[in-house]
């Protein structure tokens, strides 16, 4: 079997699939990407690079499409070189949206094309118009509509597609949903597991909270409104007054991963820390962490805050549940698909820092009561998101 994976990042969502398929000597697994770092045993990584990025003078609605076409064009050239070297994949599996899969049916018309569909953009009813303080206008509506162009081309071209959650599948046009299967990538429950009385000591960044009894954690790729960062900082300002022994660990980069950036190179971290003066001795910004350090943060967490607009569900929330974290999460659709209030976590209004703080205090004040919720949190992942159960099913789906 010859399999071609396509994703601008490496190994991304295809890490376990590529590794498992690469272990079989009967398979030839090739991974097309533009990320140079990293390797997987049994997988041949081949690189592509866009000739340029979208030009500034391109209409701003069309820039994402132009970038996707340029990505697809680079992958087309890569695919043609693979074809010239007699590599004709039986299966192509790529991530839709960036553009790598756009022209695969032109190079390999007989190959099965599978696409990983993470998100379909809608101006109303999900992330874009969620915040009443940041309303969208006609320009936004038009821009968002055009942003789906490369995804729509993939929906048309692919043989089948996969979406990781029910909520994410529901964002796609109804007429294409029969093509999509809901199947999560899976969480490694043998890696993400609780450790009783875990202490947080990270020598690499000189962080030692081994003597701290209350640690509230937060994890995100960036620090932005999409993942509730402004609400988090306001919540911390309330909690610092009410819990003088509590420390806060924020894992993430000082950037915007999703949504709009602020003008004049400002960051949401800088703006929020000016707005809410905090005791910086009790708040620890770690930047992004290697997996083993990130795991230690989750294992030592007293309460883990997860906030998101109605958008793509973060792997980190599921990893936190698997680790037995007590999650205080936003009562938004992607979270409610997994967490039931008072059963395997505590839900709060995304926009109400006082309520978020109150539920964090509720969790800190009732550790015995929360043990059952923590146990149920892990049970949720073991039963429904266990990588070792889902990976064989994912492989079966690919081979259909």
Describe the role of every protein-language-model region.
Residues 52-62, 111-149, 190-199, 254-263:
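Acceptor-binding helix/loop patch of EC 2.4 sugar-transfer enzymes
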Residues 255-256, 261-288, 292:
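Nucleotide-activated donor-binding/catalytic signature segment of Leloir-type glycosyltransferases, i.e.
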Residues 122, 140-213:
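Donor nucleotide-sugar binding/catalytic pocket of nucleotide-sugar-dependent glycosyltransferases
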Residues 159, 296-312, 325:
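Acidic donor-binding loop of glycosyltransferase active sites
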Residues 1-44, 388:
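N-terminal subdomain of nucleotide-sugar transferases
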Residues 355, 362, 369-384, 390-396:
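A short, well-ordered alpha-helix in the C-terminal region of glycosyltransferases
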Residues 341-342, 346-353, 362-367:
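Conserved acidic donor-binding segment of nucleotide-sugar-dependent glycosyltransferases
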Residues 203-227, 233-238, 248-249:
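Conserved donor-binding/catalytic core segment of Leloir-type glycosyltransferases
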């Amino acid at each position: 079997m010859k399999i071609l994976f396509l994703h601008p990042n490496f190994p991304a969502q295809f890490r376990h699939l590529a590794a498992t398929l690469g272990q079989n000597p009967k398979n030839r697994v090739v991974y097309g990407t533009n990320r140079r770092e990293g390797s997987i045993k049994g997988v041949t990584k081949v690189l592509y690079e866009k000739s340029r990025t979208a030009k500034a003078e391109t209409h701003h609605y069309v820039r994402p499409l132009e970038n996707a076409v340029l990505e697809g064009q680079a992958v087309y050239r890569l695919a043609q070189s693979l074809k010239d070297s007699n590599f004709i994949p039986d299966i192509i599996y790529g991530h839709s949206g960036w553009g790598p899969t756009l022209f695969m049916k032109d190079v390999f018309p007989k190959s099965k094309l599978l696409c990983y569909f993470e998100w379909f953009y809608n101006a109303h009813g999900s992330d874009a118009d969620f915040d009443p303080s940041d309303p969208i206008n006609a320009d936004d509506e038009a821009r968002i509509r055009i942003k789906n162009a490369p995804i729509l081309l993939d929906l048309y071209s692919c043989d089948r597609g996969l979406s990781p959650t029910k909520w994410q599948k529901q964002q796609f046009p109804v007429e294409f949903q029969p093509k999509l299967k809901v199947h999560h990538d899976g969480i490694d429950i043998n890696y993400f597991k609780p450790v009783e009385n875990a202490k947080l000591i990270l020598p690499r960044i000189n962080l030692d909270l081994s003597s701290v009894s209350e640690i509230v954690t937060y994890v995100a790729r960036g620090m932005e409104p999409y993942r509730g960062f402004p609400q988090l900082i306001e919540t911390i300002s309330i909690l610092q007054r009410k819990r003088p022994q509590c420390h806060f660990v924020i894992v993430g980069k000082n950037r915007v991963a999703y949504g709009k950036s602020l003008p004049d190179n400002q960051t949401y971290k800088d703006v929020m820390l000016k707005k809410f003066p905090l005791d910086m001795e009790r708040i620890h910004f770690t930047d992004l962490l290697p997996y083993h350090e990130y795991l230690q943060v989750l294992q030592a967490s007293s309460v883990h805050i997860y906030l998101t607009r109605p958008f793509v569900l973060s792997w980190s929330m599921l990893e936190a549940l698997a680790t037995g974290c007590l999650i205080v999460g936003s009562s938004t659709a992607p979270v409610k698909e997994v967490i039931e209030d008072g059963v395997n976590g505590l839900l709060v209004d995304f926009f109400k820092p006082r309520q978020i703080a109150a539920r964090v205090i509720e969790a800190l004040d009732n550790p015995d009561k929360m043990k059952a919720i923590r146990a149920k949190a892990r049970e949720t992942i073991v039963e429904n998101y266990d990588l070792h159960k889902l990976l064989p099913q994912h492989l079966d789906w690919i081979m259909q």
